């Protein structure tokens, strides 16, 4: 038996990661390495959104 998955909590945490990544981007200013790495981080967060947050939204509507 697999443990229950709390998609709402995961969705909240993903949104929090997105917010923090934006803060890092603002704090990093024009440092090229920060700009590149935040861009990569946001792409990874987007994949999490596709995999988790979108499913969470579907589950809420059913």
Model regions and ranges:
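N-terminal acidic leader/helix
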Residues: 1-29
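Short, charge-rich amphipathic interface segments used for partner binding and complex assembly
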Residues: 29-62
